Amino acid sequence: MYIKGEHEFYCCGARVKISEGGIKILTEPLVKYCPLHEALTGIKKIDVEAVRRTIEMKVKGFGFCCANRLFKADPVVAYGASEMMQFWLEKKNVECAVVVCEGAGTVITTNGNLVQAIGSRLNGIIKTSPIPEIIQYIEGMGGKVLDASTAKIDQVEGVEKAFESGFKRIAVTVAGFKADVISKIRSLEAGIKAEVTIFSVCNTCVDSEKAEHIIKADIACASASKIVRSKVGGKALLQLGVTIPVYALTERGKNLILAYLADFKDKLVVFRTGKLPYSAEGRGPVLSEHVKSCCSNCCEDIKF
């Protein structure tokens, strides 16, 4: 597996740059331990070298940022954005999805398997560059790349293109570090009279200002963020999971999640509560010390 192009993304809250020249960890990880990360990689203690090993595993294991990237549509996590979008597309709950893929940028597709194959093990992509083989595969599977010449990531323009293509019920992912895009999509939605389901993802690095935008999403993943749990989770109508909770913030989001759960094969526990978010001490990620100190005042009621 050989890396092509240049790409930046977040992994465990660390900013990472990957290119033909190798893997560079640009910032320290914000997370010391994550149960989901351990389950997927076998890595318990997260530091700079652990982040490097994680990326190396992605490159070697499924060709992350490589010409021969593997596209597998098997489910990876129970409540993932791509898993849910795959289901919604298959059941016609939404008509198309606007997602992001390394080597391609913003992608518009009606193919649920393609959404899952792109997103199943993807990190929060900050910027990427074109990988022709990835673009060719996506287009061969019926996907439309927003800008094949630059691999531009622009979810607002992606939603616009989806609407111009005739779709009225659109699902879109928005990464937490670009949360202001959520507000822009809401403004666009009102103007074009479409129904846009916004799924907020990759929220480990979110600050309080970004959280104000995330509240406008339909569904939000808490990732490893105490701020999201505190500021966004308190607005939730429904919560999925405890370790890495996912919040339904609107009736539309709640109904889509309930549709997904109606077809879910594993056993479930459902109970009523007077207050969200629901948390259990010792069940969530462990943040690095400097992140803990930043969150201590606004999130002291949230227990990991």
Identify what each model region corresponds to.
Residues M1-F304:
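Conserved mixed alpha/beta catalytic, RNA-binding, or beta-rich assembly cores of soluble enzyme
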